[in-house]
């Protein structure tokens, strides 16, 4: 099976990061050659850029600067980690990708979805995800989850007002409308177990479609159904 690029998207507090970790372990247990990574970050240079973007002291960061920093982190991450993994036939699970930039900077920051996509088109060299899962949660509930999680370190985006987070959600809806075949929606307000099951079922179905011959079916339950 050729390498496959699967991305996970959602607003703050959607719970996708936790789900990715669990899905990653399940795929490993089923013998899938898979890696887990994130944006911005995943490698040394991009993690340093992440710390600059997320630093709560950098409230003066201008919108275009923010968009370009994300794009720079994305490029280095692709070159060092994602491209090599895909070339080796691995499944890549990535926490956020270009859709985040379109929703956050393109729509919520008001830079324009098309304009931000143009920046990223130069960066990604047509490397769009094969499958994207959007974790759907109302912005208010997502922020309530963050507030209740005492172990989560607050970043600069967490400090934005509710209007911004609602705009991010609206931005995602516009991105989903542009890429309806690629982006699948997960109801993230369910219990974690239900969210994981829905996520794994979509990924399993997708991987089975791509698996040549179809002799080694992947399923959430570990049985033959």
Swiss-Prot record:
Name of this protein: Thymidylate kinase
InterPro entries from the UniProt entry: P-loop_NTPase, Thymidylate_kin-like_dom, Thymidylate_kin_CS, Thymidylate_kinase
Keyword annotations of the record: ATP-binding, Kinase, Nucleotide biosynthesis, Nucleotide-binding, Transferase
Function of the molecule: Phosphorylation of dTMP to form dTDP in both de novo and salvage pathways of dTTP synthesis.
GO molecular function, one term: ATP binding
GO CC terms of this entry: cytosol
Gene: tmk
Lineage per the UniProt record: Bacteria, Bacillati, Bacillota, Bacilli, Bacillales
PANTHER family given in the database record: THYMIDYLATE KINASE (PTHR10344), UMP-CMP KINASE 2, MITOCHONDRIAL (PTHR10344:SF4)
GO terms classed as biological process: dTDP biosynthetic process; dTTP biosynthetic process; dUDP biosynthetic process
UniProt KW Transferase keyword: yes
Gene source species: Oceanobacillus iheyensis (strain DSM 14371 / CIP 107618 / JCM 11309 / KCTC 3954 / HTE831)
Transmembrane annotation, as ranges: none
């Amino acid at each position: 099976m050729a390498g496959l690029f699967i991305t996970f998207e959602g607003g703050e507090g959607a719970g996708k990061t936790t789900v990715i970790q669990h899905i990653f372990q399940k795929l490993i247990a089923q013998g899938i050659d898979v890696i887990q990574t994130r944006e911005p970050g995943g490698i040394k240079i991009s993690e340093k850029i992440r710390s600059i973007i997320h630093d709560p002291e950098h409230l003066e960061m201008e919108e275009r600067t923010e968009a370009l920093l994300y794009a720079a982190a994305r490029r280095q991450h692709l070159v060092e980690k994602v491209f090599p993994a895909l070339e080796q036939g691995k499944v890549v699970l990535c926490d956020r990708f270009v859709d985040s930039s379109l929703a956050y900077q393109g729509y919520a920051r008001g830079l324009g979805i098309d304009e931000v996509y143009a920046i990223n088109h130069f960066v990604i060299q047509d490397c769009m995800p094969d499958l994207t899962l959007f974790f759907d949660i109302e912005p208010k509930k997502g922020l309530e989850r963050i507030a209740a999680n005492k172990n989560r370190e607050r970043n600069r985006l967490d400090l934005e007002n509710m209007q911004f987070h609602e705009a991010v959600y609206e931005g995602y809806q516009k991105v989903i409308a542009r890429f309806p075949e690629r982006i699948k929606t997960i109801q993230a307000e369910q219990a974690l177990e239900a969210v994981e099951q829905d996520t794994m079922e979509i990924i399993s179905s997708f991987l089975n479609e791509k698996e040549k011959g179809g002799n080694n079916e992947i399923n959430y339950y570990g049985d033959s159904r």
